[in-house]
A protein has these predicted regions:
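Short phosphate-binding/catalytic loops that engage adenosine nucleotides
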Residues: 55, 120, 146
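Adenosine-phosphate binding glycine-rich loop
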Residues: 128-200
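Short, charged/polar "capping" segments at the starts of alpha-helices
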Residues: 65-69, 133-136
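Short, conserved SAM-binding/catalytic segment
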Residues: 70-76, 144
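ADP-ribose/adenylate-binding Rossmann-like module
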Residues: 60, 97-108, 113-140
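Short amphipathic alpha-helix with an adjacent loop that forms part of the alpha/beta core around
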Residues: 83-93
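Segments forming oxygen-rich coordination pockets for charged ligands
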Residues: 1-62, 69-71, 96, 140, ...
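Conserved SAM-binding strand-loop segment of SAM-dependent methyltransferases
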Residues: 76-82
Length: 303
C-alpha cells in the first residue's frame, strides 16, 4: 500500500452496556511531535529511544557538530540555528512535547522566552537542570515579566526520578515522563473523546482508503489478554487486516466476524473467550475475555 498524507479525523463507536449504549469518539491523529532543544549526548539518546515509541522528533541546536543527521539519526527534522530562530521555524503548538536539554541556562532562558512569546503552551514542557539552578533561572525570568503560571507548567527537573546516572538512563527517565504525560492526555475525556496518536502508519493509511472496511476495537477485557482496551484492527473486503488485537484464535474469530460485517453492512458486538488461546507468535497463553465492537465503514465514491 502506497503511503498517503495523514489527516486527523474522528470516528464514533457505540458500546453496549448494562445501562444502554455508551457512545465515544476516537480521534485519530499523527504521532505527537517531540521538540528536543539541544542536541547533546542526552538529547541524542532521547532521540534514539523516543523515535521507537511513536514520537516525531524535531531537534535543534546552534552547533553544527551536534545538530546534524548523523548525531540525531532518527529525527524527522534537525535545525542548526539559534534556539529562538529554530523554535520559530518549528512552530510549536498545543499538541507538542518540548524537552529543553541545552548546554546551559543562558540557552534555556532563550528557549523559554521564545516559547512564552509565541502565546502557545505546549502539551508538555520539560527542562533539564538542578532544582537550585532552575529556581534561580525562573526567578530571573519572572522579573523579566514572564508569567509564573507559565513557568509552573514546565516539568523540572525533567524526567521521572529513577535514580538515572548515565546518559542513556537520563534519556529513559525523560522518555518515561513523556509516555506518562502522553497516556494521561489520551485517557477518556468528559466529552467522550479518546485520542489515538500512536498507531502504525500502515494502519492509518488503510483507515483512510476509499474502500469499504470494518473497524474492530477492543472495548473491554477481563483476565489475561494479549492487548489492552483500545486495541484496534482494520479489515478490508479481501480479508486483509491492518493493526492487531492480539493475534491467535481470538483475532481470527474477530477477522471472520468482520467479514460478516462487511457482507451485512451492519455493526456488531462480539465477546471473545480467549481461554487457552495462544497470542500471536510468542506462545503466550491467554485466559481472559475481550469485548470487541466491529463497525462497518462504507466506501467513498468519487464524483
Amino acid at each position: 500500500m502506497n503511503p498517503v498524507e495523514f489527516h486527523p479525523f474522528e470516528m464514533q463507536f457505540e458500546v453496549p452496556g448494562t445501562d444502554g449504549q455508551t457512545v465515544y469518539t476516537r480521534r485519530f491523529q499523527a504521532p505527537r511531535r517531540l521538540i528536543i532543544l539541544g542536541c547533546g549526548y542526552v538529547a541524542q539518546s532521547l532521540c534514539r529511544f523516543a523515535s521507537q515509541l511513536e514520537f516525531d522528533i524535531y531537534a535543534a541546536d546552534d552547533r553544527p557538530s551536534f545538530a546534524n543527521p548523523y548525531t540525531m539519526t532518527n529525527a524527522k527534522k534537525v535545525i542548526c540555528d539559534s534556539f529562538p530562530a529554530a523554535i520559530e521555524q518549528i512552530h510549536p503548538d498545543e499538541q507538542d512535547f518540548v524537552a529543553i536539554v541545552t548546554r546551559g541556562h543562558k540557552h534555556d532562558a532563550d528557549c523559554i522566552r521564545t516559547l512564552y512569546a509565541s502565546g502557545i503552551t505546549p502539551a508538555y514542557m520539560g527542562l533539564i537542570g538542578s532544582k537550585r539552578r532552575v529556581a534561580g533561572l525562573f526567578e530571573n525570568l519572572c522579573t523579566e515579566g514572564i508569567d509564573r503560571s507559565f513557568l509552573d507548567q514546565i516539568h523540572t527537573p525533567i524526567g521521572l526520578d529513577i535514580g538515572a546516572i548515565t546518559t542513556d538512563e537520563i534519556a529513559i527517565s525523560i522518555l518515561s515522563e513523556l509516555i506518562l504525560c502522553r497516556s494521561r492526555l489520551s485517557l477518556w475525556k468528559k466529552n467522550g473523546i479518546l485520542e489515538q496518536t500512536n498507531l502504525d502508519p500502515v494502519f492509518l493509511n488503510a483507515l483512510q482508503t476509499k474502500e469499504e472496511k470494518a473497524i474492530a476495537v477492543v472495548v473491554e477485557r477481563k483476565g489475561s489478554t494479549p492487548v489492552k482496551t483500545g486495541a484496534i484492527m482494520c479489515v478490508n473486503a479481501l480479508g486483509q487486516s491492518f493493526g492487531t488485537i492480539g493475534g491467535g484464535c481470538g483475532e481470527h474469530e474477530v477477522l471472520r466476524k468482520a467479514l460478516e460485517v462487511l457482507s451485512d453492512k451492519k455493526d456488531t458486538f462480539l465477546s471473545v473467550d480467549m481461554t487457552n488461546d495462544f497470542a500471536g507468535e510468542e506462545g503466550m497463553v491467554c485466559g481472559g475475555t475481550m469485548d470487541v465492537i466491529i463497525r462497518y465503514v462504507p466506501g467513498k465514491v468519487e464524483i
